[in-house]
Each structure stands twice: as structure tokens, then as C-alpha cells.
Swiss-Prot record:
Keyword match Iron-sulfur: no
Zinc finger (C3H1-type): 260-287
Coiled-coil blocks: 537-565
Source organism of this protein record: Oryza sativa subsp. japonica
Stated name of the protein: Zinc finger CCCH domain-containing protein 54
Amino acid sequence: MRCDRCARDTIHPIESRALDRSRILFLLCCYKRRPRFRFHVHQWWWWVAMEVPELVKLAFARVQRVEPEHVGKIFGVMLLREPDEDELVQLAYGPEATLLAKIEDTKAALTVIYARCSAAAAHGPPGGGGVGVGGGGGYHQQPQQLFSRPPVPACGGVRHHYSPAAAAAAAFGYQVQSPQYWPDSPPAPPTKAAQQEFAPPGLVVDASAEGPYPLRGGQHVLDDNNFGGGYYYPAGEDAFPNGGGGGGGSPARARRSNGLSTRRPCHYFSKGICKNGQNCHYSHHQVYQDALAGAAINGDVYNHQPGGVTPGSLETLEMEITELLNSRRGQPVSIASLPTLYGEKYGKGLQADGYLTESQRHGKAGYSLTRLLSRLNKIRVIERPHGQHSVVLAEDAAKYMDFRGGGGGGGGDTGSVPASSHQIYLTFPAESTFAEDDVANYFGQYGPVRDVRIPCQERRMFGFVSFQSPETVSTILMRRNPHFICGSRVLVKPYREKSKCVDRTCVDNIKSMVPYCPPRFFEFDQELYTAEYDASRLMRKQLAEKREMLLEMERRRATVRRLESMPPQFAYFDCSIEDASPLHSLQDDSKQLDLMNPSLASPDPLEIVSNSQAPPTQAGNIYDDHESNQIELLPESPFAASAPAGNSISTII
């Protein structure tokens, strides 16, 4: 017949039977996989009438000589794999062994397709139509369109499944049932009779082979990790190595067919430091289920308690953390670093259902893990000097809670003296080289040092020193800045408690998490920080008032001494500097005052030690540091040194 649009001679497949099925399969493959072949209908049938390449003809003839009964199925799968020109040359002119190996691989793929399609047909809806086509070979024929997806119903809650492997199997000439819905339970493995019924003659199915779907000769093409629920088609992936026949996507998309989560496990959650919680893009469910499965294997009791852990797992966790703390000689371990140390020691993640472990001073909530650890009997949760929560053995908790008030670990009064009165804040250059021991030795001159902490950073510029007695802190703050430790200039400032910031930041973050997180994420005691914050605020207020009182008293003493020592002739300042030369008399008076007040004239031995460690260019320079806080600096005596000649009379004042 002649096409009216393209004015070319075309051959309709219904009117002419000259085209065999292998050529039609090859054309269908090209039509599906190659966009450039998607012409109009009249152009499509005109392309069908074209001659198939000679290589395909020769390869088809060789396969037909070996497998005359199933040449259409075998050669169709070969063409669906989209062989390039070299592979076609191997099929057409290669050795006989290569051809036989290709045919055997194709038979194995066909066996898998038959087995999978039989399992899918067993779960098809009643009256579901087949998708088989065109005829011959005694197989059922139905005039349905190839590669057509099942219609989507009006309800949006039912997902439909389409398997290109099943459509390709239907194109090979047999009837399969197309599943119209996702079943609630995975299908049962096909029986040997069903496999033999769908398998072509000459293909032997080994029923004694292991696995849910045995294959020919015990060769396992299916992998239990690659499919689930009876709806993953590895044969389709094998037939389409470029991803064209395995459901149009990766194995992860194919695994989505059975309803399981395709998200990968969260690496940070397995280590206990995932900050995204339920909003994480990765899966937390699989990691937690693995932990529960391991607990069941070890004989743990499976009675769930609030917090997502079991009593048996709590005992195991307590024993492991106790062993970890004993290996560190009882030193406190911060909750932020506990999961990392736990993973390094035991090779598994320290995890409870949905907790966070970031430090509260960074504005992250870590209540769930803190509450979990507080349930352990042999471990106490304490609050360290600068706002971090740490875990310590119960027998060692008293050493760290005597001035902190318990910190939530039990024991002690929450209204005791805050840490701000026991420690100081240090600032120093980034190029300093001294260690924590050097800082402890230097400040040990003022009083017993409890702890020195310098954060491990690439450019360290601050640190904290805590003392046994608050009087030591007051003594150091009354000294003049700077201090010199190993030649480095160190400034000392009072440590300010950040309990108020902790309360506000944590509560604000918890409130912001309300629309996104379940209620168990913000189960915490708001009274944990209230009493401590009130006590620290009162102590800071008292300390500031005491400091202001001392400064005011010192100013008054200095003013009285200056007025009493001033000669009568200089009581009035209406004379000029040239007429009255008070400098000589002022020097004599200052010498007399130095003899009367040896505490003002003689230098402090601690100050001598500090200046002796300073560099040569700085040891002799006594100056005020504008960077330091002006509150804790005592005023200098106006008679400590004589003023140079030529100064104004304001020097005396």
C-alpha cells in the first residue's frame, strides 16, 4: 500500500506476514530506548519495512540453528540488551563457544523472568487481563498494546506497579498477569510445577537449589539483598545493563516496590551525634532496629520503656560506660564526646531513640541523652565549670560537685556557690606555646588550682582556670594585667556565668522544634537551671557590690592622703607654675609617704615574679591594658612615681 503523507511504499504488518517476530522486537526495542526513532505512525511502519542489518540477520540465523524452537525469545532478549556492533559481530561471526555461552545466559535470564512473572500472576487481581501479544507457539494472544502502563484509578492512595521485564516477557509470546496494586504481604515462591509450566522445553529448573527462587543448575542470579517482597526484577536489570529495563531506575527505586525505606542509614545517628533528629534525610529506623535485634539475640528483655531503650539494654549500657570511665581513670567525659569515645572503644554507636548530644552552650538540645544517662545508677551527670554536661562515676562525683551543686547528677544542693566565683577567664595570643601545666604552675602561686582547660583549636586564644577557693579568684582579679607565662602576655578577666543564655537558648530552640518533632524530644525539667541561675545572679550581684565598695574606699583613702600631705602654700592654685615650683617639695613628700606606707612603696613579690617572666621589652614597662576590664583594676597611687619636669599642675590633682 502507499502512504498518503510521505508518498512511500509501506507494508502493514496485518496485511503482510513477511516480517518475523524477531525483527519486530528489534524495532520495538529501538522505539522504546531511542528517542530519535519515535516518529509518527506512518513513519514508524515505513521504518519497519526497511531491511534489518546484515549482522542481525546472520546472528539470528546462527541462533536459529542452535535453538530453532525458541529463537524468537532468545534472540529478543539479546536485542533488548542493546548489543553494539562488536557484540553483533561476535554473534554473527564469532566462535561457536561464544554463541553457546550467550544462549545459555539468555536462557538463565528467561528462567528468572518466568519465575518472577508466575509469582506476580499469583497476586494479580481477579479478572486481571494479560498483556500478551501476537501469536504462534501455542501461547495465548490478546490484542493489547505493548509497553503500556496500567490505568491509574481515581483514588490516590493506591500505587501501581509496572514491570518492563514482565512486558518484555509478554512480548516473547506468553501470557502473564499484570499486578494492579501493591499487596500487603510478599508473594509466595513459585512452585516447581509453575516454573516448569512457564519454562520453555530444554530449560531445567533445579528445585533443590537454595534461595526463594531456584534457577537452572543451582546458579543463583537473584540476590536476597537486591529484592524484597517479590517485586524486584534483577533479571530485568541483567537484561538491561544500562538501566532501561529494571523499572526505569536504579535498584534503590526497584526496592521501593515492597514499601521498605530506600533511604540509607544515617552515619551520624549511628555515632549518636545526628543533630537533625526526625528531619534527617537519612534513615534512623534501620539503625535502631539493628540495635534492637542485637539486644534480642543477646537475650535482653523486650519490654520497651520511655526513651526507646529496654531494661536489658540499660544494664548493658551502664556496664559499658562504667568500663569506659574506668579506662580513663575516673576523669569526667563530656556528653558531646561520649558517643565518639564509645564508638572507638566498642565499635558501635551509642544510641537511644532520637536523642541529640550537642553541647548546650552551642544552642543544641541534648536532653534525651542526658535523661537517659541520668537513669543509670553507677553514673552521674554533672555540669562542668563552663556549661558542659559530663558523665563521671558515682563514687567520683563528689569531687566535682562540691562547688557546682550537683549539675543534675544527684547529690549536692542546687543553690550552692556558682562556678563564676571559682574560675577566671584567660585571653592570650594565638602564637603562645605554654601548656596547661604551665598555667597551673603560674597561678598556683596565688592559691590551689583545681582545673585548667584550654580548648584544642588551631588558633587557641582563650582558656579557663578554676580554683579551690573564691578568695584566690578575687586576689588574682585585684592584680594588674598583664601576666606573663612562658614569655606570652596573658590577660585575666572575670568569668561570667552563662546560665541565663543557656536557659533562653535551649527553651527557644525547643519551642522552635515543636511543629517538627514529636513530644518526646523536649521532655526536660525546666527547674534544672532555675535555682542555679538565681543563685549565680545573686552571687554576681553581691560580688559586684563588694568590688564597688572596695574601690570607693580606696579612692577616699587616696584623696585624704593627698590633701593631708599637701603644703599650705599650695592649697590655692591661682599662682603660676613659674612662681611656685612644687615639684621638689612633692618629691620630698612622696618620699616621706613611702617611708610611712611601706605597702605602697615596696613591690609585690608576685608582681616581681610576673614581670621577671616578661620579655626584655615588656618587663620594664608598667602600663595599663585598655583591653582588660576596668572594673577589676585598682587605681594607681599618684605618689608611686615622680612626674617629669614640665608637666602641668593637673599631674598633682
